[in-house]
Amino acid sequence: MSEPGAPRPRFDNLSDWLDWQERFHIRPIDLGLERVGRVADLMGLRPASAPVITVGGTNGKGSTVAFLEAIYRAAGYRVGVYTSPHLLRYNERIRLQGEPVGDGPLCEAFAAIDRARDNISLSYFEFGTLAALWLFRRESMDVILLEVGLGGRLDAVNILDAHVAVVTSVGIDHQSWLGEDREAIGFEKAGIFRGEQPAVCGDMDPPRRLLEHAASLDTPLALAGSDFHAGPVAENGVWDYHGMGMTLTALPPPGLAGSVQRGNAATAITAALLLEDQVPLTERAVREGIAQARLAGRYQCLQQDPAVWVDVAHNPQGARILGGHLADEPVKGRTLAVMAVMADKDVPGILEPLRSLVDAWYLGALDVPRALAPEELAVHLEGAAPVQIQASVAEACEAALLQASPGDRIIVFGSFHTVAAVLQAPFPWADAPLKSA
């Protein structure tokens, strides 16, 4: 509802707001903090309305945020979460108390931004970031979790000073924006660090420039492998966390599937411990949160026999992680891959760790301008396992299902759009709710 005397909002439904935002700014991606920071100040959104943990990294961002969200909710805190991109609905990007924000509050937030921006142009992502911060302030969140959209140093979420900054991993992706190697990319991701404010790096091989940037700011940096780590898994699935001068023994298996998730959980625990002076936690909340975390599209099982898994892996590092999951969990039958990918990705680098693990490939088209045509993707698979091309990702998945036998598994991957296409198609799992934490 508009404030008394306020001008009528530009639009009264979410779809119109989002369509307009996609066309409004001169560039779809426009990294930089000046414009969005000025509007944030005009709206009174700085400093932050609650303690902030900002999470960046090439892979593992969403999972680490999901663990943190579940831990803080288990402790009884009011948690505001901002992530991107979304899978099915824009509303997924902003969560209040574990639930996607409704259309009405989003429209109110966009109207407030539009009134305040004083002719300053904003990108689609900048509108979303400001909407999240406005809603977190209005709803009086106890803790705010922000996922970096792209890079870190010039990403819109970096208009707020993080009380704890997290870089989960550093791999090669988005080179045209962030640089061609891990050193350049690591520096961009370290841009969320603040002087004398704690930070966490979950990468076991942190780039030198990331370490140097932390040192130049006097940022206390907790490093995976030396300052904290996840212990091995016992036969009953439990594991130990070691770090920050303490040990948490017999932690439950993480609520997210895949061996990599213990490392993401350990990174989240470390970040939460570093914020304990402002947001105290109990060991019980940590245990419950680790077990209860959920996140759609991250090595998520949709059905059994044949097993259907979806994973948003879309860069070489993500593909290596996915390949590790598949190798760790061999099946009696075949592994069938349903894939579509964006044209600007390192396709050979994505395929390399998976070639030997896949017995048949099913490629489909995506109705996305950036998508690589399946015929072009097939060229990269010449000499590999058999390849089928279908008119859409959903039809590619249907073909894989029809040709799968008991004991086979199907893995759908390559981008958020690929996973979304399968989640919203009329398969048996289509009505299953999307879960975050």
Show which residues each predicted segment covers.
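Acidic, Mg2+-coordinating active-site environments of NTP-dependent enzymes
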Residues: 120, 142-147, 162-250, 265-287
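A conserved segment at the C-terminal end of the G1
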Residues: 55, 63-80
